[in-house]
A protein has these predicted regions:
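Short, low-complexity disordered leader/linker segments with a strong preference
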Residues: 1-35
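Alpha-to-beta junction loops
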Residues: 85-95, 108-110, 141-142, 184-193, ...
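Short, polar/charged alpha-helical segment
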Residues: 43-73, 78, 102-106, 153-160
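Short helix-initiation/N-cap motifs at beta->coil->alpha
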Residues: 71-82, 95-97, 164, 169-185
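Extracytoplasmic "Venus flytrap"
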Residues: 31, 35-54, 148
Length: 271
């Protein structure tokens, strides 16, 4: 996986290089694009997306060019890349690096154009049984979570650190909310959890067994299709510039940001 992460980093450099040089080539005329479909990812809750939704930054900036921005709500990384491949999505605003790697290895033409965040502490393995004190105690247990994601990668890394293999647990592929529900009902022994569902699980009596710190870097990326990058590079550049506006708001408008954080149960975001 480390080699794949290096490849992911190289793909970012490659995509940014393509963007920086997009103005110098003569290309065949491409019809103007008057819409932009950007995922709004709620789980885990991430501050730049919340800031953008509150301030309507993308809508206002692209509106100046008469471009309509819509925000399909897709939390699953796999479903984001599926939508990208089908052409029903233009920008994966917050895509797990693991999901990007798996999609690319399966032939999806996804291009990483930026790093959204790195927040390993936001991704957790949670349990309810007090007898489970470490990853080693997961041997033979049933664990649920979204397959092929950063959370899944953390599970594999935690097991490896405990000298266990992925096959030493009974893994069930479920979404995060369903995994928490299964943990609370006793159907499984451990759940892979992120976002506001961590707080929900804790309120119901679950505890964090471990998080991604020291196991993975938990890179969340911004992805577009190769076609989008090739045909509409200026839109991609503008998207990244507007995203930076949201980051600048986070850094400068501390009081307003805290007010937004109080409205939603947001986990810390490390850039």
């Amino acid at each position: 996986m480390n080699k794949k992460l290096i490849a992911l980093g190289l793909s970012v450099i490659t995509a940014l290089t393509l963007l920086s040089g997009c103005g110098g080539e003569k290309k065949a005329a491409v019809p103007a694009k008057n819409d932009l479909k950007v995922t709004y990812v709620k789980s885990p809750l991430n501050i730049p997306s919340i800031v953008d939704k509150h301030n309507q930054t993308l809508v206002k900036e692209f509106g100046k060019d008469k471009v309509t921005v819509t925000f399909p709500e897709i939390n699953s990384g796999a479903k984001q890349t599926e939508a990208l491949a089908s052409g029903s999505l233009d920008v994966c605003s917050a895509l797990g690096g693991t999901s990007a790697i798996l999609a690319a290895s399966n032939g999806v033409d996804v291009k990483v154009v930026g790093i959204f965040s790195r927040a390993p502490k936001a991704f957790n393995i949670m349990v309810k049984d007090p007898a489970i004190k470490s990853a080693a105690d997961l041997q033979g247990k049933k664990v649920a979570g979204p397959k092929g994601t950063i959370l899944h990668q953390i599970l594999v890394a935690a097991l490896d650190k405990a000298n266990l293999k992925p096959t030493d647990v009974n893994f069930v592929s479920l979404g995060i909310p369903a995994s928490v529900n299964a943990l609370m009902s006793g159907e499984i022994d451990a759940a892979l959890v992120a976002g506001s569902d961590v707080l929900r699980a804790q309120k119901a009596g679950a505890k964090v067994l471990c998080n991604g710190e020291g196991l993975v870097d938990a890179t969340i990326v911004i992805g577009v299709s190769g076609k989008m990058l090739k045909e509409h590079p200026e839109m991609v550049k503008k998207y990244l510039a507007v995203h930076q506006q949201n980051i600048d708001f986070m850094n400068k408008e501390t009081e307003k940001l805290m007010a937004l954080r109080r409205r939603k149960p947001v986990l810390p975001l490390t850039r």
